[in-house]
A protein has these predicted regions:
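Predominantly a Rossmann-like dinucleotide-binding segment in NAD(P)-dependent oxidoreductases
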Residues: 70-75, 80-191
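NAD(P)-dinucleotide binding in Rossmann-like oxidoreductases
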Residues: 186-197, 201-220
Length: 220
């Protein structure tokens, strides 16, 4: 029967030492992704990491340095790149059906404010990032497929510049005030991440991509 390792935040290290796996799939909370990936590579395993791969530039460079030092692969598992619709369109692009791609638009838009009332699972930790960062917290679901369509970082074109702007942060504070007790943590911790974040990316060849994030606004 499959073995289970639990009971502490570092039990994965015991698993790495005892099982010596060839590869590790990491689907923990965001703050632990990079650290577990680096430890996995140092123990001889390839690391496959859920989105996002890391939450800081320092973590990203640690991943690069560790991968190069250990000669182990480290891949962010951006699952939307492999969706049926996305792969169909990628195939059409590569066959020349679509023509020259000059502009793309991508987004991660769906309402997650009900997570504010959760005490277990993703809702127990994910809202915290909306109190710490004002930016696009989750760009790659939309940006990943568009980057593939444009063949970015695979030859002559790549990301060159980005400008991002956020709306005011109103929705999460309003939801907490209406639906949660006055002494709840989310009524005593202000949210700073704008309800809508819009970024424009320019590539080296001058192509443009609009990327949006909105996990807060109520939508049908």
């Amino acid at each position: 029967s499959p073995l289970s390792y639990s009971g502490g935040d570092t039990e994965y290290l015991t698993m790495l030492k005892e099982l010596k796996p060839d590869a590790v799939i990491i689907s923990t909370d965001w703050s632990t992704h990079a650290g577990i990936a680096c430890d996995s590579m140092k123990h001889g395993a390839h690391a496959f990491v859920e989105v996002p791969l890391a939450v800081s530039l320092e973590e990203l460079w640690n991943l690069v340095d560790t991968s190069e030092a250990t000669r182990k692969h480290c891949m962010m598992m951006e699952n939307v790149n492999y969706g049926r619709d996305e792969l169909m369109f990628l195939n059409m692009v590569r066959q020349g059906v679509i023509g020259d791609l000059l502009h793309g638009e991508a987004a991660y838009i769906h309402c997650l404010v009900t997570q504010l009332g959760d005490t277990r699972g993703e809702g127990a930790w994910r809202p915290e990032y909306h109190t710490r960062i004002n930016g696009n917290l989750y760009p790659t679901h939309g940006l990943g497929p568009v980057a593939q369509y444009m063949n970015l970082a695979r030859g002559e074109d790549h990301f060159s510049r980005v400008a991002a702007f956020a709306s005011p942060a109103l929705g999460r504070n309003a939801y907490a005030k209406k639906h949660l007790p006055a002494d709840h943590r989310w009524n005593n911790t202000p949210f700073i991440c704008g309800d809508m974040n819009t970024a424009i990316v320019k590539t080296q060849l001058g192509r443009t991509i609009v990327v949006q994030l909105d996990e807060t606004s109520p939508r049908p």
